[in-house]
């Protein structure tokens, strides 16, 4: 699915991505010399409020190894951004204990589906089981009443 590209917004995301990588200690420039690296990072930090300048900084200074990773990160961010606009595509996150995640993951693999689909399947199965149990109990009560008469 294609999503609209918004230059200003995406340039801000690119700037944030590069700054985060730099803060994590990963090389964001193509340079080896420390002074060149520092100068390039200073330029990057200086253009925080001028997002469109990030594109020229990327062309001029960014490490080629980071190119694909940056594109993938921005593509994922764009997808999440546009999916968050509609309630049916908005994602929610939950915390699971490791053992619960492991069981859910095994069930999802067994069913050949995603974790979300597995949860939905298990809930619908539990609901059907509950309805069947109520029906059986109701039949037992009716039968007991008939036999008592």
Curated annotation (Swiss-Prot):
Pfam families: MatP (PF06303), MatP_C (PF17414)
InterPro entries membership: Arc_rbn_hlx_hlx (IPR013321), MatP (IPR009390), MatP_C (IPR035375), MatP_N (IPR035087), MatP_N_sf (IPR038339)
UniProt KW Cell division keyword: yes
Keyword set, alphabetical order: Cell cycle, Cell division, Cytoplasm, DNA-binding
Gene Ontology molecular functions: sequence-specific DNA binding
Subcellular location: Cytoplasm
Keyword flag DNA-binding: yes
One GO cellular component term: cytoplasm
GO biological process: cell division; regulation of DNA-templated transcription
Family indicated by similarity: Belongs to the MatP family.
Self-association state and partner proteins as the record states: Homodimer.
Function of the protein: Required for spatial organization of the terminus region of the chromosome (Ter macrodomain) during the cell cycle. Prevents early segregation of duplicated Ter macrodomains during cell division. Binds specifically to matS, which is a 13 bp signature motif repeated within the Ter macrodomain.
Family matches, as NCBIfam families: PRK05097.1 (NF003471)
Protein name stated in the entry: Macrodomain Ter protein
